[in-house]
From Swiss-Prot:
Superkingdom of the source species: Bacteria
Similarity section: In the N-terminal section; belongs to the enoyl-CoA hydratase/isomerase family. In the C-terminal section; belongs to the 3-hydroxyacyl-CoA dehydrogenase family.
NCBIfam families recorded: FadB, PRK11730.1
Chain's role: Involved in the aerobic and anaerobic degradation of long-chain fatty acids via beta-oxidation cycle. Catalyzes the formation of 3-oxoacyl-CoA from enoyl-CoA via L-3-hydroxyacyl-CoA. It can also use D-3-hydroxyacyl-CoA and cis-3-enoyl-CoA as substrate.
Gene for this chain: fadB
Protein name: Fatty acid oxidation complex subunit alpha
One Pfam family here: 3HCDH_N
Organism, as annotated: Shewanella halifaxensis (strain HAW-EB4)
Site (Important for catalytic activity): residue numbering on this chain: 119, 139
GO BP annotations listed: fatty acid beta-oxidation
Catalytic residues (UniProt): 450 (for 3-hydroxyacyl-coa dehydrogenase activity)
GO cellular component: fatty acid beta-oxidation multienzyme complex
Oxidoreductase is among the record's keywords: yes
List of residues binding NAD(+): 324, 343, 400-402, 407, 429, 453
Region (3-hydroxyacyl-CoA dehydrogenase): 311-717
């Protein structure tokens, strides 16, 4: 053994080839400070052994290296610039040391080689991957750029255009795509990875492969003619800004760094990368996006823990077909859990199967699936007009019409047809789980399972714990949602649960502005372009359906009359009474037609303005800051109330629910990250300015206490 540490081992193989193996004690290899120090020491040991003629890097895990240890980031990024600069320089000394070894080097890649893992393989002369490999630099998704030489080496290996596409998108690449652009040198079956890697290294040792020229290219300026460079970077800036927008600076910074470093050697190019990295690491966007990543890990960790308590789900059933039922059936079947789709009407079953087939066909067209896989998934969906195929299923998702009596009747009926230990859930967005549980003989095996529409796109599932729901029931539903590829958050029962409970105060703030004469299109523009929502409130209500919104609003008003009760007609009532339900009947706040791609196209409709003006009088203009304050303050305070009341367990889960369930702007991180960023005291002062607008604008006593103590919702790094 040449070197050994808890994360790395180096041994000598035949023909004087050293083998450096990453073998962390946890489930995956990642670059924390300890591993970087170990790699440095390992490389020193390798350099000192003059018998070594080549080096192979590999992993003892299912993945090569998944990246840097992001749990260290927030604390590190809070340090002074000089500390961050020193950390980057010390880490890059290690990667340079790997690149500068006096013999050929090769990475044998299995599974994920992402972020710092990708930067490791770029520092070697050759790269060979097996078919399980996924390679990429996802740092822009965290609001930063690669910091261990990724922006320097990748353009010199695969060309500037390809590197710009890889790094700005943050997507990981399949081995065939990586091979096509020259990021790797060969793709082999997993069992052939080691022998193929050793053969390639031996060819390099025998000078059949020119490793010195390859290495020299990585150390030199980019070989890109000046005019071509100008055109390439100008085009990239336009395309990337169109996708990333003004709220996400990291992708644009990547272009700037690669452009500036194009005429530089390695040392100077790395300094350019370091300076840009430090600048981005200090931004609120990076704090928010890293926070989302860490919150996502926390939520997934909870789901994994729930899996240990969960009842095994081998088969499922959804009651109620149609678009929603078809979406749930598709999601379950495509992730490997066979499902019965039961309805009382054949046309509804046809619609549900059609929805699943449509989604699968789209996957095949995009090259993400094959006709054979599509057939397998469709065969995993069993349509039924009676309960016979449902009786042996492990979990049932009731997804019939959103009406308490209908749901209660269906739940009582299905309980008579399933086994004693089958789990029963309701996909409801507003109806009390405790109320529905009264229709069951065994309420302990029942809870809510709220999917968001469209099911195949929306990552969140709210798992609603009723007062009688057992721990095993909740854990089993969480595990099933995870198996379906969803992110489950557990919430306690209350009107609207979590997501809808915090959404409708936002709509109330919007309605209040319209009652005071604001233009709904102007509000949408501010909330989309400035605050960063994917859709403004008027557009979102049109997409959700104003009939659905009107019903949910009534449920919320009944549940929280002191804050959400209405004294008169609002804009949602006006649209509902005029039978303007949104996209579903092509008229809501906006009017809709179908574009050339078959997608809904929205336009302004004079009738909407006439209806609103007749009810609320002449329009008047509002400043952007007031629009943001009057819509967001109610949502933020209601989110805090949910935490204080124990409806949601933690700020992390609340923020994930908002980002994944409502599209809360990721660069703001969620309500609690946003509060910490602007300061709780500043928010309280802002809310007090609008307190005269009613109960939705009244901050809680706990918020005032936190503000007085200069506190925060997340533990400060």
């Amino acid at each position: 053994m040449i070197y050994q540490s808890p994360t790395i081992e180096v041994e000598l193989l035949e023909d004087n080839i050293a083998h450096l193996c990453f073998k962390a004690q946890g489930s995956v290899n990642k670059f924390d400070r300890e591993t970087i120090d170990s790699l440095n020491a390992a490389l020193d040991s390798i350099k000192q052994d003059t018998s070594i003629k080549a080096l192979m890097l590999s992993s003892a895990k299912d993945a090569f290296i998944v990246g840097a240890d992001i749990t260290e980031f927030l604390g590190l990024f809070a340090e002074e610039d000089a500390v961050l600069q020193s950390w980057l320089e010390q880490a890059n000394v290690v990667f340079n040391k790997l690149e500068d070894l006096p013999f050929p080097t090769l990475s044998a890649i299995n599974g994920f080689a992402l972020g710092a893992g990708c930067e490791t393989i770029l520092a070697t002369d050759f790269r060979i991957a097996d078919t399980t490999a996924r390679i990429g630099l996802p740092e822009t998704k965290l609001g930063i750029i690669p910091g261990f030489g990724g922006t320097v080496r990748l353009p010199r290996v695969i060309g500037a255009d390809n590197a710009l596409e890889w790094i700005t998108s943050g997507k990981d690449q399949r081995p065939d795509a990586a091979l096509k652009v020259g990021a790797i040198d060969a793709v082999v079956a997993p069992e052939q990875l080691r022998p193929a890697a050793l053969r390639m290294l031996k060819d390099a040792m025998a000078e059949k492969l020119d490793w010195q020229t390859r290495r020299a290219k990585k150390l030199a300026p980019l070989t890109l003619p000046k005019l071509e460079a100008m055109m390439s970077f100008a085009t990239a800036k336009g395309m990337v800004f169109k996708i990333a927008g003004k709220h996400y600076p990291a992708p644009m910074a990547v272009i700037s760094v690669i452009e500036q470093a194009a005429q530089c050697g390695r040392a100077e190019a790395l300094q350019i990368e370091h300076q840009a990295f430090i600048k981005l690491a200090k931004t609120e966007v990076a704090q928010a996006l890293i926070g989302i990543f860490l919150n996502d890990q926390l939520v997934k960790g909870k789901a994994k823990k729930a899996g240990k308590l969960a009842k095994k789900v081998n088969s499922a059933a959804v009651l109620g077909a149609g678009i929603m039922g078809g979406g749930i059936a598709y999601q379950s079947a495509s992730k490997g859990t066979p499902i019965v789709m039961k309805d009382i009407a054949q046309p509804a079953l046809d619609l549900g199967l059609g929805e699943a087939a449509k989604l699968l066909t789209a996957q095949v067209k995009r090259g993400r699936s094959t006709p054979a896989k599509m057939a397998t998934v469709l065969n995993n969906i069993t349509p039924a007009l009676d309960y016979a195929p449902v009786k042996d299923t492990d979990i049932i998702v009731e997804a019939v019409v959103e009406h308490p009596k209908v749901k209660s009747m269906v739940l009582a009926e299905v309980e008579e047809h399933v086994s004693e230990d089958a789990i029963i859930t309701s996909n409801t967005s507003t109806i009390s789980i405790n109320l529905l549980a009264k229709s069951l003989k065994k309420p302990e095996r029942f809870c809510g399972m709220h999917f968001f529409n469209p099911v195949h796109k929306m990552p969140l599932v709210e798992v609603i714990r009723g007062e009688n729901s057992s721990d095993e029931t909740v854990a089993s539903v969480v595990a099933y949602a995870s198996k379906m590829g969803k992110t489950p958050i557990v919430v306690n029962d209350c009107p609207g649960f979590f997501v809808n409970r915090v959404l409708f105060p936002y709509f109330a703030g919007f309605s209040g502005l319209l009652a005071d004469g604001a233009d709904f299109a102007a509000i949408d523009k501010v909330m989309e372009k400035q605050f960063g929502w994917p859709m403004g409130p008027a557009y979102l209500l049109d997409v959700v359906g104003l009939d659905t919104g009107h019903h949910a609003q009534a449920v919320m008003a009944e549940g929280f009359p002191d804050r959400m009760g209405k004294s008169g007609k609002d804009a949602i009532d006006v649209m509902f009474e005029a039978e303007r339900f949104g996209q579903k009947n092509n008229k809501g706040f906006y009017q809709y037609s179908v574009d050339h791609r078959g997608k809904p196209k929205k336009d302004l409709d004079p009738t909407s303005y006439e209806l609103l003006q007749a009810e609320f009088g002449e329009q008047k203009a509002f400043e952007s800051d007031e629009i943001i304050a009057r819509t967001m303050i109610p949502m933020i305070i209601e989110t805090v109330r949910c935490l204080e009341e124990g409806i949601i367990a933690s700020p992390a889960e609340a923020d994930m629910g908002l980002v994944y369930g409502l599209g809360f702007p990721p660069f703001r991180g969620g309500v609690f990250r946003y509060l910490d960023t602007i300061g709780v005291a500043n928010f309280v002062a802002l809310a007090d300015k609008y307190a005269h607008l009613g109960g939705l604008y009244q901050v809680t006593d706990t918020m005032r206490e936190l503000a007085a103590n200069n506190g925060s919702y997340y533990q400060q790094a």
